[in-house]
Amino acid sequence: MQNSRDISFASMNLYNLQVPGGKMYRGATYNQAEYDAKIAWTAGMLRHLQADVIAFQELWSRQALVDAFAKAGLTDAYELAFIKNGSWRGITVAAAVRKPWVILERERFKQFPLEMSLTKRDVPEDDILAPDAADIPSEDVGDNQEDEAADIRINKFSRSPLRLSVGHSERADVPPISVFCCHLKAKMPTQLDRGHPDYELMKPHATAIGAALSTIRRTAEATALRVILSKYMKANDVPTVVLGDLNDGQMSNTLNILSDQPSYRVYADSRSARRNDDGLYSAVTMQQLRTLDNVLYTHVFKGAREVLDHVLVSEQFYEHSDRRRWAFQELKVWNDHVEEEHDESSSDHGVVRAKFDWWPA
């Protein structure tokens, strides 16, 4: 029998959920029939999910998500959270929290934290030369050094993360959970700036340069989020969860930065993972460590299947931690609808849900 303190987290990319006539990319719109089909599919998935906390991505309109919950018959069961009151421009994240869980606080991040900087100066030759190498011509020493100078001027998220503090309305022994709902920059190449003075020179290489720009931005966003997470997680026992379309695989550099690469316990006699103050554990990895079926994916591109949508949890959800409050039960992925030529009424991403049982250490 399920304990009311058990909890499940889900991530769902809505794939451009917008009201009829509302503008999307390149002026695209839905007619009423297309909107009805999209709302019907979204509502059906919400009913299947049965998750306590859901993070959404690619939402254009508040009303569209309200309509989906109404169609699913779940309006009274969930409280919805958006990045701000009123309307917004472009796609955003949103969230839903099911009773008896409640939203205690909400916070949006747009600017990178002040501590976040991706710059590195040129190293002066005096710092490169060792005392016993003073007789070596400086130009020869410099030629053998790696040039690590960098100046990356990104200072805001492309899509604002939303942080919720989620509490239990009936149990005082359950600590509030800090939930970050995220959507990092996509892998799709960024369009080049046509006004750039070297645009014509760059144009033949637009795909490579655009992909590099997207990768750099996604890495910067992961780093900024890591800085924010560390400020919230260090030196306290606040359970923390990161949900969302992170647009990279679990072993990618993006996820390594974001998770801080905690150790997993892979055999019973190990003492690994007893403590990790600000690391985040991947529900995908936890599922893979306990099942013979390792074929998990939430996205398909040119035949390549990978997990881009993640549930990352702090040590309070890891069963081998001395600070455990919950233990991982299972990860489920709905991905039958994810095909190269998927139906526009559905999504181009799989939907993930991770369940955790209340089991304090």
Name each region found by the language model.
Residues M1-V93, Y199-L201, D237, W326, ...:
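N-terminal, active-site-proximal structural segment of metallo-dependent hydrolase catalytic domains
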Residues A208-N236:
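A long, amphipathic alpha-helix that forms part
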Residues K38, T42, S61, R218-E221, ...:
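Stable alpha-helical elements in mature extracytoplasmic
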Residues L59-Q63, D67-K187:
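Structured beta-strand-rich core segments of catalytic domains in phosphoester-bond hydrolases
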Residues M1, I103-E107, T119, K156, ...:
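Metal-dependent phosphoester-hydrolase catalytic domains
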Residues D6-V19, P176-K185, H205-A211:
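Active-site-proximal beta-strand elements of phosphoester/diester hydrolases
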Residues L17-G22, M188-T190, H320-S321:
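Short, solvent-exposed loop/turn elements at domain surfaces
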Residues Y15, L59-W60, K185, L246-G249:
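Catalytic metal-binding/acid-base residues of hydrolase active sites
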